[in-house]
């Protein structure tokens, strides 16, 4: 059962694209449209990902930032995440106007994270590649990987855990430490088929 209708997913992707283009070209932060569906004012976690069109998977990512927790209305969070992904991802320089025609926009709407309980060595059995995203936390360190990432890279559950630890700036086996907290979540993902093209629900398996 989907929480996000296909037409809402398309609305969010178009909104993210507009937010990015207005900010990159004009330095303007757009307001939520008047025709925003009421359901999209509910608070939800969301990430916006920018990919280089037709680039190999290892080279495709151009920016990805979002909010794991439902702290903003989804429509507002999408605008914020889109702009941040375009100009504030510390891994990349800000997106330039001439790049906009070569980037696809992807929006992932997240469920609230839930802790994975039990002995650490059982954690791989409690997650599923193609369904779950992960958050790893220990002390001041935290890292998140979206559900599509292990699918795109061909990881199994243990490698997914190790890579999320690495993303947090921790040793790759930190998921075996009882002091490390691991959370899982799911996401409904919508993407442009090509820059400014039709929007589709992204299958993970």
UniProtKB/Swiss-Prot annotation:
UniProt xrefs under InterPro entries: AMMECR1, AMMECR1_dom_sf, AMMECR1_domain, AMMECR1_N, AmmeMemoSam_A, Uncharacterised_MJ0810
Gene3D superfamilies (alphabetical): Hypothetical protein ph0010, domain 1, Hypothetical protein ph0010, domain 2
Domain called AMMECR1: residue spans: 7-201
Cysteine-cysteine disulfides: none
Cited NCBIfam families: AmmeMemoSam_A, PRK00801.1, TIGR00296 family protein
Protein name listed in UniProt: Protein TGAM_1450
Organism: Thermococcus gammatolerans (strain DSM 15229 / JCM 11827 / EJ3)
């Amino acid at each position: 059962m989907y929480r996000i209708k296909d037409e809402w997913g398309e609305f969010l992707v178009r909104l993210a694209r507009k937010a990015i283009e207005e900010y990159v070209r004009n330095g303007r932060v757009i307001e939520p449209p008047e025709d925003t569906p009421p359901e999209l004012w509910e608070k939800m976690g969301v990430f916006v990902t920018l990919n280089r069109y037709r680039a190999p998977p290892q080279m495709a990512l151009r920016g990805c930032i979002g909010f794991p927790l439902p702290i903003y209305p989804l429509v507002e969070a999408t605008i914020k995440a889109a702009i941040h992904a375009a100009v504030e991802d510390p891994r990349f320089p800000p997106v330039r106007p001439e790049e906009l025609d070569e980037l696809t926009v992807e929006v992932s709407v997240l469920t609230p994270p839930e802790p994975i309980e039990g002995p650490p060595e059982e954690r791989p059995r409690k997650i599923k590649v193609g369904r779950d995203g992960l958050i790893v936390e220990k002390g001041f360190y935290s890292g998140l990987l979206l559900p599509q990432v292990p699918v795109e890279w061909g990881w199994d559950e243990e490698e997914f855990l190790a890579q999320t630890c690495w993303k947090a700036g921790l040793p790759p086996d930190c998921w075996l430490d009882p002091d490390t907290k691991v959370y899982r979540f799911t996401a409904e993902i919508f993407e442009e088929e090509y820059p400014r093209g039709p929007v589709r629900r992204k299958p993970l398996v």
